[in-house]
């Protein structure tokens, strides 16, 4: 882990100190590199964005992004937890200190995936696309009410948790403040929005645009969710405009004249009927969805639906709920844009502090808007005057001007007058609480102790989330099947779902060790050892009959020691064998010739013992358990043993001479231990089975058999010699 962290530091210069671990690259944002990491203070995985400060322009963009994201607080916007300096240090309140740093880190909410990754698996169902589009419009309504333009909406900047299908807008690196009271013509940056999601107005006039550019991008994203591919994918700006003109009608004559001045080659006399309308580009789309999309993808920004109007469209009626679509309580104004300009001058940069950007210090009554100019001389955005003309009615949140607004909320016993209205995560202590306050409590839906939160607290406790549809979560399987299977998290809080990463890793390792121990304990057959022993046996020479008997006796003794066969059978066999061999040993005191002439009584005893051994072997074969040695030897070609027929003692010798080594089929077979003793031709040097058996009776072979004592073999060899 330490080596991996050092490599990330060396390659990317990503240094957060020892507080963050398990860094993994996620991608690049609008102006920085993004990693995921685990915060050791609360065991929670977060996303960390690094912004490099190399020149005054980068400092201005970083300050603008930090200023915007710290004030925005909405369910469909990625939450920001804190801003850190190099090595994870805390930033001071002085904004001027930002110019002295080489980088800053934005610690924000970690999301499972983004819409671009989801669309790589194919198009979405229309129900899923409508749900995601509703949440996108819900977030845009809040962003635009704060007088902010995102300017970089695309699937890669829309983050999704597939468990609950929550979509959140992220990456405000290219966002900017735009007060609708003033015209920003000629003062806006150009070429910011990704080319495929640029509106026609942005292509014609890169320095003059409004909030409508975000709505055009939202419409292109909605069409991409339905088809799985980019709606207008031009290789350059001219081709991008050509693709738009082939599908989007140009209704107004002034727009056609403007196009005629810029690109006269592609302009026709009648452009109200496009060659490839949206019905051809989006086959199979419902009529309601097509009407909804046609009102968003309009050539003129004045005809385009706003976010609030799109939420009221009949296509969104199943999700629309105006009470649960909040707007910003503290929108940005022109003074916040002036701050960006003043920050470029070092003589003014140290007089502005961070506290200025937490809450706006000036209202519209305090700010001298028209001190030096008449009302008619001030240029305004035409979209701001489309519906209303009164200056105060343009303000989005009318509650800002109500008298006694704060005092009526102090009557709530749950409201503590000594509690600061600032977000709790601004302070270095109580660091662990910032995640729970933003993720687990009911206050995460709105800004803490704001008027919108207090008004909606009662009905939010009783109402379910109206746009949450479990059936859609079940249907979203094409992405889930290709992602790793997750553990069941039903019944857990969000902290338990998102936190305790180290504890989960330790639990998984402990469970794996427990499974391995149980596997070793319950192991009944070691396949590896079986293969090794089988190979070893195959490399040895072919065992003789006596070796087979010794191995068989060894296997029987092992089975007996493990309790796999009954001890009474083995004991009975051993007692009979010892008794017969004891009688045989008593007869060995006489000469070999006398033993042979005595009507074969000793041979009969030995044959009887061998027959009993064969019967025991037959019992072992019928047993359910068979060792791999028994199976190995059973494959050898062994002649079938014959049971001795009861004959008279006088005829025993002659019968043994003719039939002791013959089976029913006439094949010669060997007694596994001592039947060769009864052969009268043992003195013959050629073809004598006695000599072959005598050669195999080595001391090692005798000692390997636990059933027959070594003393008996010694006495037999003595007489044989």
From Swiss-Prot:
Active site per UniProt: 152 (proton acceptor)
Swiss-Prot/TrEMBL cofactor(s): Mg(2+)
Key words of the record: ATP-binding, Cell cycle, Kinase, Nucleotide-binding, Phosphoprotein, Serine/threonine-protein kinase, Transferase
EC number annotated for this UniProt entry: 2.7.11.24
Zinc-finger recorded as keyword: no
Protein origin, superkingdom: Eukaryota
Chemical reaction(s) catalysed: L-seryl-[protein] + ATP = O-phospho-L-seryl-[protein] + ADP + H(+); L-threonyl-[protein] + ATP = O-phospho-L-threonyl-[protein] + ADP + H(+)
SMART domains recorded: S_TKc (SM00220)
Regulation of its function: Activated by threonine and tyrosine phosphorylation.
Phosphotyrosine: modified positions: 628
Occurrences of domain Protein kinase (ranges): 20-316
InterPro entries, A to Z: Kinase-like_dom_sf, MAP_kinase, MAPK_ERK3/4, Prot_kinase_dom, Protein_kinase_ATP_BS, Ser/Thr_kinase_AS
Bridged cysteine pairs (disulfide): none
PROSITE patterns: PROTEIN_KINASE_ATP (PS00107), PROTEIN_KINASE_DOM (PS50011), PROTEIN_KINASE_ST (PS00108)
Keyword ATP-binding found: yes
Motif (TXY): 626-628
Residues holding ATP: 26-34, 49
Family: Belongs to the protein kinase superfamily. CMGC Ser/Thr protein kinase family. MAP kinase subfamily.
Function noted in UniProt: Phosphorylates microtubule-associated protein 2 (MAP2). May promote entry in the cell cycle.
Listed name of the protein: Mitogen-activated protein kinase 6
